[in-house]
Amino acid sequence: LTVYGLKRPLQLASAGGEYPAISSLAAAVRKTHPGAWIDLAHPASWDLPLLVAHGAVDSVRVVHGQFCRDEVIDRQTGLRERDKARYPGADGLARWSQQIYFHLLNCGLRIPPTAASLSGEVPNPVGYNRTYVHLEGPFSAGEWWQGLRAGQVTVGNGPLLLPLVEGKPPGCVFHAPAGAAVELQPLLSISYRSHEPLRYLELIRNGEVEYSLSLDDYVERKGNLLPLKFEQSGWFLIRAVSEISHTYRFSITGPYYVQIGSEPHVSRRSAEFFLDWVYERARMIRLDDPEERRQVIDAHRQARDFWQAAVARAAAP
């Protein structure tokens, strides 16, 4: 976790290990530092389902420190391993990180993505991985954080994406009554380096590629992407990947949401993905003290209940 907005040094009860549960530490931050922002530093963090279930995550760092200017660091310590047969190479690492985030969105959770360079820890210059926030008025730090909370973001290290859908930035929720349909026209402006052409541009809908456009397609359409029609709740975002061989350079917009009726989009498959993850993580707990073990196991049981409830209310496959 990375915590922003602290007014004084953070006093931690533990320097690491299983006890207390990291969700308890995050809760202590919320209590003692009102207004602090908690960013999950990697989507594959073993404790992601636990932290999300306890309301301890304000944002997820989808563009993280493994993505470097001249390489992709494909070494995972303390992270949930991906299936490298299914997600091979640098592209696979990026798709795995994004897919975890998409599963969160598929559970009806409206958590914005972020980016960070980890300059000083990995071979990245300051500002390589970037979080852009759309502001309606003059810049201020407070307005920037409010814009991030609203999901009005584009994150990445590749092309700068400036989307508008029906005149709205990312984070917008389009509402419609039950039984109605929502038709939307995405408009996108892209800024990229001439020596790093666009490899592809995709619209992601409910975690799947809805369609892909080449740069020629984009230019021909003059920034007007293909229209979308929703007859059920869901979400979508835009992803762009650069044509570059020595690293993986990409950008994604924050998601747009469509809510038809009273319920957001919740996928059973995505909820089960995190429920299985909670069980797998709980089996890793090693604590000798009975009381410490009881407290930590209880935190994981609460997370299990959260994801079981998500499975129960899922209306989508």
Predicted region positions:
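Catalytic cores of extracellular degradative/oxidative enzymes
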Residues: L1-L109
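C-terminal functional module detector
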Residues: A28-V29, H33-A36, W46-P49, F102, ...
